Each structure stands twice: as structure tokens, then as C-alpha cells.
């Protein structure tokens, strides 16, 4: 690995550990936000830029100063970010991406997965025996006590079952709006990331997911109607912010999924159009169609694609997508 990649990776690590925005790094180091954005890119991306060693030295000095002033400050203020995977349209691979990103993150971070899709496909992939699920999304919304299912030392799961739809119908929409946000608060100091798999349709639970989230991740396919629906997501997020329901929410990443390679002309036109409309949110790396992705999430396997098929090209694609999400 080259020295510049090591420097860039270290700056990314500082950004994540101290929950800094790109604008924060620019303010601390004195470099422009545009420069910082290029440091956050992967080495293979077009506008990737080597971060100067001086920037890293300034950040290290900032960390030392911060620690000497308040050595327990970072631990006390540690709070998980909430990433929600959603799209109004089903069949875009939303759950598959949430599954893999959750497992990949849990290699080095503590992750809590919450299944808010009544279909429960993510729950089925992570909890092989439904009888092992002692605490569900319905329990969470109702404020009941319980412990998430332990998939591994670093990965907890709050799965869903058939009661979720009835539970949501029994709660007034105005109350449900904030219940998810309020009831996951206790987990924010226990985990580094909380990942929510949202249902693929609008409604009170969908709004509750938006109210609870920091980052919205939107998988989509190179389908004209699918791409048109992306604007709806941005409008919903804007509405949530304008109504002061959640001012800390943003659409962080649009992930092109199930892309046939080499790209067909029509697919390229659709993806170029999305890139033009949403240049900051559009992930430059695509996820290919692969039977391996169906295999790895089956309950009998339940492994991240990077473990199940580490040499497959789709594993490298997922690593790049994860990097984009974390640094968005």
C-alpha cells in the first residue's frame, strides 16, 4: 500500500472515530472542503487526491489537544449513526445490500440491525431459527424490554415477524412517528452503527424510519421508472427536515445495483442522468448482477459476500460501496 493511501486511510479513520464532517476536517486543517472530499475517495476514483502529510499532522495535533482538555469526552459523546436502506420500489436489492453492509461493518465495529420491513427477509437471513428471536421490532416500538438477537459478538439483530403490521396499525400515526427514534436512543452508546431495513412503501412506519435516521441509503436499478422515483426520496427527506421532525437527516448515497456489465447503452444513459441530477450522492461504483449474492444471504449460508466469495468481482464492488457510504 502506498504512503498516500495510508495517510488518506488514517484521515478517514479519524473522521469516523470522532464523528467529523468533511467541513470539520477542512476547518481543522485549513484545507478546502473540495480537497477533503477528494481525500475521502477511493484510490481508483477519477478525482482521488493524495492527502498531504501536513494535514494528518494537524489532525493528530488536534486529537492530542482534545484529549488533554477532556480525555473522556469522546467516549461520553459516542453515539451511533443510523443508516436506513430504503426505496419506494421493491425488487431493487435493498435488503441484500443492507445484509452485506451490516456484516461487513461488524468485522471492526459494533452494529445493530433493525428490520422494519414486514416481509422480514433480512430477519430470515440473519436469524436462522425464528424461535431464537426473543425481541422483535414490534416489541421495540411498544417500548417493551428485551435483548437483540446476537448474531455475533459485534452484530445484534432486532428482527421482525407477522405482528409488525398489526402493531403499526394499532398505534396512532402521530405517536408512531417518533417511537422508533425514541426507543433506539438507548442503543446509540452500545453500538457504532444502527442499520435499518425499511419497508418499500410510504406510510406511518416509513415516516418513523426517516425520523430516526441520520443517513439514507437508496439502492436502485438502471430502470427509467426506478430512477424517476429517486426524486421522491429527496422530497420526503426535505419534508421531514422542513417540519423539524429530523434536521440531521440526509440522503447520503444512491447505490446502482444489479447492473449488467458491460453497460448497455440504455443503462448508461439512465445512470448518467442520475449522476447529473445527484452528483454528490451518486456512488461512482456499481454492484453487478451475481448469483453469489443470492447464495450468501440464504439462511443456510448467512455470510457477507466478501467472506463467501472473496475473489469474486462483486466483493470488490461491495468494498468500494461500503467505503463510499462510510465517507458520505
Residue spans for each PLM region:
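Generic structural marker for isolated residues within well-ordered, non-membrane alpha-helices
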Residues: 11, 22, 271
Amino acid at each position: 500500500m502506498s504512503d498516500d493511501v495510508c495517510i488518506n486511510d488514517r484521515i478517514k479513520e479519524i473522521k469516523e472515530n470522532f464523528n467529523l464532517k468533511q467541513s470539520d476536517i477542512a476547518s481543522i486543517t485549513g484545507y478546502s472542503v473540495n480537497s477533503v472530499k477528494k481525500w475521502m475517495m477511493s484510490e481508483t476514483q477519477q478525482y482521488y487526491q493524495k492527502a498531504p502529510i501536513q494535514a494528518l499532522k494537524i489532525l493528530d495535533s488536534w486529537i492530542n489537544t482534545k484529549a488533554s482538555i477532556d480525555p473522556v469526552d469522546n467516549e461520553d459523546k459516542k453515539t451511533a449513526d443510523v443508516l436506513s436502506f430504503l426505496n419506494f420500489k421493491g425488487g431493487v436489492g435493498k435488503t441484500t445490500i443492507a445484509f452485506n453492509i451490516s456484516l461487513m461493518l461488524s468485522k471492526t465495529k459494533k452494529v445493530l440491525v433493525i428490520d422494519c420491513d414486514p416481509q422480514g427477509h433480512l430477519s430470515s437471513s440473519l436469524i436462522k431459527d425464528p424461535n431464537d428471536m426473543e425481541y422483535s421490532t414490534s416489541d421495540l416500538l411498544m417500548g417493551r424490554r428485551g435483548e437483540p438477537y446476537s448474531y455475533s459478538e459485534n452484530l445484534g439483530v432486532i428482527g421482525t415477524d407477522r405482528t409488525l403490521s398489526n402493531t403499526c396499525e394499532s398505534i396512532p400515526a402521530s405517536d408512531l412517528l417518533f417511537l422508533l427514534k425514541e426507543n433506539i436512543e438507548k442503543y446509540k452508546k452500545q453500538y457504532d452503527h444502527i442499520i435499518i431495513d425499511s419497508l418499500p412503501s410510504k406510510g406511518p412506519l416509513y415516516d418513523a424510519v426517516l425520523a430516526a435516521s441520520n443517513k439514507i441509503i437508496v439502492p436502485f436499478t438502471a430502470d427509467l421508472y426506478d430512477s424517476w422515483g429517486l426524486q421522491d426520496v429527496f422530497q420526503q427527506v426535505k419534508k421531514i427536515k422542513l417540519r423539524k421532525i429530523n434536521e440531521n437527516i440526509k440522503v447520503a448515497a444512491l447505490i446502482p445495483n444489479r447492473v449488467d456489465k458491460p453497460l448497455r447503452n440504455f443503462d448508461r444513459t439512465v445512470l448518467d442522468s442520475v449522476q447529473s441530477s445527484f452528483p454528490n450522492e451518486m456512488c461512482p461504483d456499481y454492484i453487478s448482477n451475481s448469483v453469489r449474492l443470492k447464495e450468501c444471504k440464504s439462511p443456510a449460508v448467512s455470510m457477507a459476500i466478501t467472506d463467501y466469495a472473496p475473489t469474486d468481482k462483486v466483493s470488490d464492488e461491495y468494498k468500494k460501496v461500503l467505503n463510499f457510504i462510510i465517507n458520505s
